Amino acid sequence: MILQNNSIAQQIANEGGVEAYLHAQQHKTMLRFLTCGSVDDGKSTLIGRLLHDTRQIYEDQLTTLHTDSKRLGTQGEKLDLALLVDGLQAEREQGITIDVAYRYFSTEQRKFIIADTPGHEQYTRNMATGASTCDLAILLIDARKGVLDQTRRHSFIATLLGIRHLVVAVNKMDLVDYQESVFEQFKQDYLSFAQQLPTDLDIKFVPLSALDGDNVASPSEKMNWYSGPTLLEVLESVDVVNASRQQPLRFPVQYVNRPNLDFRGYAGTLSAGIVRVGQKIKVLPSGVESTVARIVTFDGDLTQAGPGEAITLVLTDEVDISRGDLLVDASETLQAAQNALVDVVWMAEQPLVAGQSYDIKIAGKKTRARVENIQYQVEINSLTQRVVESLPLNGIGLVELAFDEPLVLDSYQRNRDTGGMIFIDRLSNVTVGAGLIRETLESVYQENTEFSAFELELNALVRRHFPHWGARDLLGGK
């Protein structure tokens, strides 16, 4: 059955006009989710089916889809819905996803942003990028193959990146005659594996056929034994609470906004908490306090702002604030740290080894860090830990970092913005890894260690003539 995009027109009619429709859209909740799993599990086809069955495809897209489906012949006489998502020529030729593709759609209940991520192991870094902003992950399992290594890998990465809602979709049920026993077996297999994952996960299971649309947006008549919700019903009903509103205030300064001599504000996106006019705030790491005089936006001043809003704060005092500083509530007693344990997803061909130094970007702040040691690498298939000397491409491990300056940090599980970082190669300026702060450590350089004059002179010479070694000032400077 071919559907054309009359969904928006119908919603406008139901709402009573364009203005009422736009107002309703602004107040809909947003769900960001990704599809992941092993190669050829049907991730792109599933997204294409969701777009098709929710009437998000225009007539010209359908015409092109018919033409491309016949030309490629990948699904016989049926539409190859994966072509709606696989945009790269290499993806279409190989029938796989390489890049992370984003798609947007909405229903009467909710707005959605989908990230279609690659299944191949060599593109795990792309999958991690897609998962970093999502609230829910759909893990596809091929009904002919079951739980595979890449399924376990993606489950681990998704939970590592803070995703707590998982939907395990057993796809291609049409190829196993819609047998309930197959679905139940894979459900038990995944639950056995999930015992090694965090205990606070919300896991749901849906049997479906993305190619034919069974249990995607409408119930399947061929699987009467399944009485649960369809995939779309799960996506519309999952409770994604914006916990960042209840968290302490975090406002990373992105730049100083000074268009003229009469205005000075500090621009950025509010990461967590609520900021209000008249609220006393503290600037970190300096510790200077002031009061919020105005909250400026493009559409005018606000009396308060919440997480995700791009704002400019004007303070009552002339305070020395620069890019990378963090504004928090004045009652906060945060301590800066110079060492931290960081979960790392490595994304470069050249492995990560102890002793190397990298540029680090975290919440608008750019600094430098040295890899003190690699505590272990996670074996994804078994989720066991093993001691290694280096972390290879797509490797995930726990690393101790020593920063060149004290930083105010949160754990990633508490705040993705102030607890997440990227590693940048200092020579090529290429992003080579992603880091998730697990906890801060008391720096060994904060101890009252006494050094001899020779040690201090040698340290100064090394830092002056061999800066690429990443040696740190023994007196605690940069």
UniProtKB/Swiss-Prot annotation:
Keywords: ATP-binding, GTP-binding, Nucleotide-binding, Nucleotidyltransferase, Transferase. Residues 116-119 are annotated as: G3. One of its GO terms (molecular function) is GTP binding. This is Sulfate adenylyltransferase subunit 1. It comes from Yersinia enterocolitica serotype O:8 / biotype 1B (strain NCTC 13174 / 8081). Residues 37-44 are annotated as: G1. The lineage of its organism: Bacteria, Pseudomonadati, Pseudomonadota, Gammaproteobacteria, Enterobacterales. The keyword Nucleotidyltransferase applies. Residues 28-244 form the tr-type G domain. It catalyses: sulfate + ATP + H(+) = adenosine 5'-phosphosulfate + diphosphate. With CysD forms the ATP sulfurylase (ATPS) that catalyzes the adenylation of sulfate producing adenosine 5'-phosphosulfate (APS) and diphosphate, the first enzymatic step in sulfur assimilation pathway. APS synthesis involves the formation of a high-energy phosphoric-sulfuric acid anhydride bond driven by GTP hydrolysis by CysN coupled to ATP hydrolysis by CysD. PANTHER family: TRANSLATION FACTOR. GO terms for biological process: hydrogen sulfide biosynthetic process; sulfate assimilation. The gene is cysN. Its EC number is 2.7.7.4. Pathway: Sulfur metabolism; hydrogen sulfide biosynthesis; sulfite from sulfate: step 1/3. Belongs to the TRAFAC class translation factor GTPase superfamily. Classic translation factor GTPase family. CysN/NodQ subfamily. Residues 95-99 are annotated as: G2.
